[in-house]
Amino acid sequence: MATSAPLRSLEEEVTCSICLDYLRDPVTIDCGHVFCRSCTTDVRPISGSRPVCPLCKKPFKKENIRPVWQLASLVENIERLKVDKGRQPGEVTREQQDAKLCERHREKLHYYCEDDGKLLCVMCRESREHRPHTAVLMEKAAQPHREKILNHLSTLRRDRDKIQGFQAKGEADILAALKKLQDQRQYIVAEFEQGHQFLREREEHLLEQLAKLEQELTEGREKFKSRGVGELARLALVISELEGKAQQPAAELMQDTRDFLNRYPRKKFWVGKPIARVVKKKTGEFSDKLLSLQRGLREFQGKLLRDLEYKTVSVTLDPQSASGYLQLSEDWKCVTYTSLYKSAYLHPQQFDCEPGVLGSKGFTWGKVYWEVEVEREGWSEDEEEGDEEEEGEEEEEEEEAGYGDGYDDWETDEDEESLGDEEEEEEEEEEEVLESCMVGVARDSVKRKGDLSLRPEDGVWALRLSSSGIWANTSPEAELFPALRPRRVGIALDYEGGTVTFTNAESQELIYTFTATFTRRLVPFLWLKWPGTRLLLRP
């Protein structure tokens, strides 16, 4: 729509002579001409130090520049009128959409009163109420707040970027962990399948060997039976003929007695062994293989269960709790017994009468495992001697199983002497009971002064080892009979499960298990009154 002549005339009146656009924030200079505020700042002095008016060339002072509020309002109204002329009926103006209007004068808000903290239009700014106040352009007043908002926004954006980066890294870590778990799952399945395959192959191999032995025994049995039946038949025929000959009259018997006896010379009849020596040897070797299999599987099961269920921990001894009868190594992992009390100063945490010592590390949860090595000359030799005795007994049993030979057991003078010395041996065993050691766990609050029983009711769960045997330190003591004397005692503590399990760390044989409800901190416990013996914590 074409602009009308009156409106065009008004537009010319409110047009800046410098920028040829509507007067923006109009101001008047000393000569009375009106320009945009921003245009006056761009005016440069032609001669001298004062700028001159672009129209009349008269100099003016910038400090004398004054705003023309009414003209600014007129410019707004012209712009609004121009827009409204092209607006459809009922359509909301852009100013009404984008800007708030003064509630009093319905004019656009341009200024901000710093004294009252209110937004002002041109009319409000020139009113008696706000004229003495400091009023600045709304954009200028908003600039510091906008900068604060932008600074805060920048901080928030950095925080957002950090969170997004943290989330991305966390997601990547989780995905990597899940991938690792999947790989470990496949590894577990593959390893167990390989183990199953190996065990199946070994099982089939052993069963094949067993089947061959069964076949050899069965064939030997048939030969043994057949040979025995043949010998019995031959003997029956001879017996029958001799019985008939014995019933003959004397005259008939004496006619050919010599010839008859010569036909049946006296000979040894066959007495064979039911099992061939080679087969018997193979059977014994197979029994040894089964023992090795049993021992190997037991060690494997014990080690696997220990490694998967329990955490192996490295423990040390607490020197402040060590009795004066004990001597600790520099690394606090080895203890020896001395018959002389060496402690000059009795620490409050020290055992005074009992030769005991506690571990420096305690446990209040979880499943943990450590070992105690018993180092003593001859500690493992008794076991080997026992094996030799068992082998000798087996040889004697084989000799007794022979055919046609036998022997009687006669008591010797040495046996009588040994029977007479039983009382002396019993007295020596009673003395050996005093020379022993204990390994186990104890509450960190266990009593340490005076003579102690060191039993579960006192907060100690331990085994007692000596050259004469092994006992669980219960009330009363329970003697134990493990297959092998342990050179290393494994101690497995399940705090929540309430168990302390002792095993032979080398053969994985279960020795004893204490059950209890633990409520206090538990620490390793050693007790040693055995000259020539050392206890070492492993690892």
Swiss-Prot record:
Quaternary assembly: Interacts with TBK1; this interaction bridges together TBK1 and NEMO in order to activate TBK1. Interacts with INCA1.
Subcellular location: Cytoplasm; Nucleus
Class of enzymatic activity (EC top level): transferase
The reaction(s) this protein catalyses: S-ubiquitinyl-[E2 ubiquitin-conjugating enzyme]-L-cysteine + [acceptor protein]-L-lysine = [E2 ubiquitin-conjugating enzyme]-L-cysteine + N(6)-ubiquitinyl-[acceptor protein]-L-lysine
Function: E3 ubiquitin-protein ligase which regulates the IFN-beta production and antiviral response downstream of various DNA-encoded pattern-recognition receptors (PRRs). Also plays a central role in determining the response to different forms of oxidative stress by controlling levels of DNA glycosylases NEIL1, NEIL3 and NTH1 that are involved in repair of damaged DNA. Promotes nuclear IRF3 ubiquitination and proteasomal degradation. Bridges together TBK1 and NEMO during the innate response to viral infection leading to the activation of TBK1.
Domain (B30.2/SPRY): residue spans on this chain: 295-539
PROSITE patterns per the UniProt record, alphabetical: B302_SPRY, ZF_BBOX, ZF_RING_2
EC number of the protein: 2.3.2.27
Expression induction: By cytokine TGF-beta and binding of activated SMAD3 to the TRIM26 promoter. Upon herpes simplex virus type 2/HHV-2 infection. By type I interferon.
Zinc finger region(s), B box-type: 97-138
Protein name, UniProt field: Tripartite motif-containing protein 26
Acidic residues: bias regions: 380-434
UniProt keyword list: Coiled coil, Cytoplasm, Immunity, Innate immunity, Metal-binding, Nucleus, Transferase, Ubl conjugation, Zinc, Zinc-finger
Pfam family, one: SPRY
Positions annotated to bind Zn(2+): C102, H105, C124, H130
Transmembrane segments: none
Record organism: Homo sapiens (Human)
Start and end residues of each stretch annotated as Disordered: 376-437
SUPFAM superfamilies: B-box zinc-binding domain, Concanavalin A-like lectins/glucanases, RING/U-box
GO terms, molecular function: ubiquitin protein ligase activity; zinc ion binding
